[in-house]
């Protein structure tokens, strides 16, 4: 493309190349819209077709996964690994198992991951992978056979200095263990090619908690910069999985009253707030094969909003921790009308572009996922460092490093987030992540 093209011309170019990839196009639009004024002031970043290269993955691997279920029936799923950018290190990003997974979603996640990893200051590139396999309702044997079948193809594309996956939606410690075990068997190599592993074979303390903890660390820093804090605040959390659980735990430690959590079936509301005992029971219920938030609500006699998200509940802080585009304009209007002060993304792109703009116009503090939920991948980077050194750090050391990284990310967002009274964290995160990746790409030439 001509180096003088406009923002809309560039976005139309991306849309035209992949007309059916709506999630990816949305992610590119969100990033480029905030970057464009910076790019016009810094024309060197429009040279050498850098932007065109930045929105095109270095490699996309697609393959079938054939496995046998408990009824002895052959099942066929589709899987991908999007190796988006290795400009600053090996590809790094999770594997997602969910029926909704497609190439558009994985490209959007890999694109976001590239900037998120750059923000951590650790030497990690961006990638993402997954399958349309649904682990819900499957036996442990079926999940194991699927993971092992998937690795018979994926293993040849991974390596400690090439591509290091981790978990994501539908992929927890169990699934990572199955995949890492099969990788070791096929490659005859025990090098670190997965993070989020069990502690018995190279995992890191604090890794399961890291995304949720990091979200709260970042949000607390954002609140403090604007004269507030979690202490005494009413908080709602969407989701009830790994990220949500540990965000609830850390928010309680900071003095917040967490009054809502959810899953795909509905929302539980507890005006008295979660306690350690209640949270432990929720985690226990959700870890069972078919455990639902409704079961938790019934057991404790709490309000249950069937089929609803938590955004109608009046709160000071909202933490969307479920999935992409869960918080739309209508939900944003509800939150704003109820006096929400801050929204911080625990999931990847859970807020639509229109809702994000609405929050910013209303003066609501808004922390984008690429900054606020970077704690998980940051601790994955720390796990890689421990594996490379053949060491295991104490929980306190990992947690302290995580906290320090999240404060550094917050500082980078503030540095690039404008000079007004209220920091534009979307702009700050996008520019800070972009500059690191773009500088590396320019230094390495046209490759």
Q: What is each stretch, according to the model?
A:
Residues 2-27, 222, 336-447:
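Adenosine-phosphate binding glycine-rich loop
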Residues 1-205, 436-445:
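N-terminal ligand-binding/catalytic initiation module
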Residues 195-198, 203-314:
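Glycine-rich phosphate/diphosphate-binding loop of Rossmann-like nucleotide-binding domains
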Residues 185, 220-228, 324, 333, ...:
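Conserved helix-loop functional segments at active or binding sites
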Residues 162-166, 190-194, 237, 260-263, ...:
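General beta-strand structural signal in soluble alpha/beta enzymes
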Residues 72, 168-169, 207-211, 236-240, ...:
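Active-site nucleophile and cofactor-binding loops and adjacent substrate-binding regions
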Residues 266-366, 371:
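Rossmann-like adenosine-cofactor binding region
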Residues 11-12, 29, 33, 103, ...:
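Predominant activation on well-ordered alpha-helical scaffold segments within soluble catalytic domains
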């Amino acid at each position: 493309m001509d180096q003088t093209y406009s923002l809309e011309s560039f976005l139309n170019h991306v849309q035209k190349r992949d007309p059916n990839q709506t999630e990816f196009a949305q992610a590119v639009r969100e990033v480029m819209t905030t970057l464009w004024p910076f790019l016009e002031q810094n024309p060197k970043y429009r040279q050498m077709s850098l932007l065109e290269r930045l929105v095109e993955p270095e490699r996309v691997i697609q393959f079938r996964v054939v496995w046998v279920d408990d009824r002895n029936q052959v099942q066929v799923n589709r899987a991908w690994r999007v190796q988006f950018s290795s400009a600053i290190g090996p590809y790094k990003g999770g594997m997602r198992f969910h029926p909704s997974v497609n190439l558009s979603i994985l490209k959007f996640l890999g694109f976001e991951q590239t900037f998120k990893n750059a923000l951590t200051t650790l030497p990690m590139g961006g990638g993402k992978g997954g399958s349309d396999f649904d682990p819900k309702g499957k036996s442990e044997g079926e999940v194991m056979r699927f993971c092992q079948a998937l690795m018979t193809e994926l293993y040849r594309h991974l390596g400690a200095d090439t591509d290091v996956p981790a978990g994501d939606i539908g992929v927890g410690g169990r699934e990572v263990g199955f995949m890492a075990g099969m990788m070791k068997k096929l490659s005859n190599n025990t090098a670190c090619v997965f993070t989020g592993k069990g502690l018995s074979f190279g995992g890191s303390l604090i890794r399961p908690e890291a995304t949720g903890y990091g979200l709260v660390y970042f949000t607390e820093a954002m609140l403090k910069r604007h004269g507030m804090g979690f202490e005494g605040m009413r908080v709602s959390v969407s989701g009830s999985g790994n990220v949500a659980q540990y965000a609830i735990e850390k928010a309680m430690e900071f003095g917040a009253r967490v009054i809502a959590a959810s899953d795909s079936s509905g929302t539980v509301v507890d005006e008295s707030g979660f306690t350690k005992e209640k949270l432990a029971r929720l985690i226990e219920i959700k870890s069972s094969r078919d455990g639902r938030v409704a079961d938790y609500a019934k057991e404790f006699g709490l309000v249950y909003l069937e089929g609803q998200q938590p955004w109608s509940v009046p709160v000071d802080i909202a933490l969307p921790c479920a999935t992409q585009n869960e918080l739309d304009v209508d939900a944003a209007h509800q939150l704003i009308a109820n006096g929400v002060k801050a929204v911080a993304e625990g999931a990847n792109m859970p807020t639509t572009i229109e809702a994000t703009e609405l929050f910013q116009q209303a003066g609501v503090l808004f922390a984008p996922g690429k900054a606020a939920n970077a704690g998980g991948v940051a601790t994955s980077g720390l796990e890689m460092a421990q594996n490379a050194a053949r060491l295991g750090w104490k929980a306190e050391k990992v947690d302290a490093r995580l906290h320090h990284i999240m404060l550094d990310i917050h500082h980078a967002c503030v540095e690039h987030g404008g000079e007004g009274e209220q920091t534009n964290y979307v702009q700050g995160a996008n520019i800070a992540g972009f500059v690191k990746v773009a500088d590396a790409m320019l230094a390495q030439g046209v490759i």
